[in-house]
UniProtKB/Swiss-Prot annotation:
Lineage: Bacteria, Bacillati, Bacillota, Clostridia, Thermoanaerobacterales
Signal sequence range: none
GO function terms (MF aspect): rRNA binding; structural constituent of ribosome
Pfam family, one: Ribosomal_S19
Annotated keywords: Ribonucleoprotein, Ribosomal protein, RNA-binding, rRNA-binding
GO cellular component: cytoplasm; small ribosomal subunit
KW RNA-binding (keyword) present: yes
Gene Ontology biological process terms in this record: ribosomal small subunit assembly; translation
InterPro entries assigned: Ribosomal_uS19, Ribosomal_uS19_bac-type, Ribosomal_uS19_CS, Ribosomal_uS19_SF
Name of protein: Small ribosomal subunit protein uS19
RNA-binding listed as a keyword: yes
Family membership: Belongs to the universal ribosomal protein uS19 family.
Function: Protein S19 forms a complex with S13 that binds strongly to the 16S ribosomal RNA.
Length: 93
């Protein structure tokens, strides 16, 4: 179920405050955040946000196409290493 329209999108207040201050100063620095559930708003476009994936911060450059999505969508938490090989390939003849 999606969030109610009357509530508006969730954005971590500290993260939004940092973005707004950087927009006023016209500077572009990488911002570290653990808030994967924050929604990307138009003020964030053009910034690089380092989103925590559980062990490190993944730098994510925000574009206009990302507006409305969550930050966590762009920092995968699991690594897929592939399925086990078939016996034919592992068996020595």
């Amino acid at each position: 179920m999606s969030r109610s329209v009357k509530k508006g999108p969730f954005v971590d207040p500290k993260l939004l405050k940092k973005i707004i201050e950087m927009n006023k100063k016209n500077e572009k620095k990488v911002i570290k955040t653990w808030s994967r559930d924050s929604t990307i708003v138009p003020e964030m476009v053009g910034h690089t946000i380092a989103v925590h994936d559980g062990r490190k911060h993944v730098p994510v450059y925000i574009t206009e196409a990302m507006v409305g999505h969550k930050l966590g969508e762009f920092a995968p938490t699991r690594t897929f290493r592939g399925h086990a090989g078939s016996e034919k390939t592992t068996k020595v003849k």
